[in-house]
Amino acid sequence: GLQGAHGDWCVVLDYWPFLLGLLLVAGISFVDDIVSLPDSIRLVVQFVSYGMMFWNLGVFDLFGKYGWMIGLGTTILALIVVVGATNVINFMDGVNGITAAYSLSVLVPLFILNNSMPIPFVLNSLIGVVILGVLVFCLFNFRPKGKAKCFAGDVGSIGIAYIMLFMIGSLILVTGDLTYLILLLVYGIDGCLTICHRILLHENLGEAHRKHAYQLMANELKIGHVKVSSFYALLQLVISLGFIYLCPNTEIAHWSYLASTIIILTLAYILFMKKYYHLHEEYLASLKNKHNDSN
């Protein structure tokens, strides 16, 4: 028993940079939930937090392996990707249950992959504890509009993003396979294409909006929050399980599966927006008319 307890403490010590980074990024997000902080402060803390994660994952070993130029370039690019992904996951937290349901659709495939590998890429109990925590949160948040008892806030959505990106990052480094980013693809498509759409509209990306596909479903199409959240989670789960069980475990098969899925989801997003975005424009026009009438 004492030896087992000592082993558990060794595991905690092995993860301390990740845990410290999680505390930092969740802490600044909690403060931001209470009093709005400048974007610059939040971004600096996020970059520092992911620096701690990269230290834990051994990303900085690239400097010794490939030299300073390649190591620095790869690290900076990876930092931009993970900070961007974190904020996309935060932006997607706009209807009841979506963060909890989608997190489960990412964590379950990670658990399956972790148990199918000769050497686990992350502590199995870590995934289990996080899944348990998300399930408990579901009891209070995975409810129809107006019925939720609590919300994730920035601290919840950014905290779970940090944890999932740590696990996926560890998986990618162990396997050398970047295509495991497919585990976050549904959020990635909606988030990135909505950002591109807003850039084309010359909008301030820092301002709140309702232009994500899931927001159009919930607001303009009046689809229930639980249905929208379930759709996103099930779509991601089907894609991930297909990748794990149906896709041959070869480099060309993995990249082909990823590329074809990106193309299909991108086309689906564009067709959806072409058909329904006018409803959002009508909503914005009605707001403008109300504002003019009040003046």
Model regions and ranges:
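"…together with the soluble PPM/PP2C metallo-phosphatase catalytic core" -> "…together
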Residues: 1-188
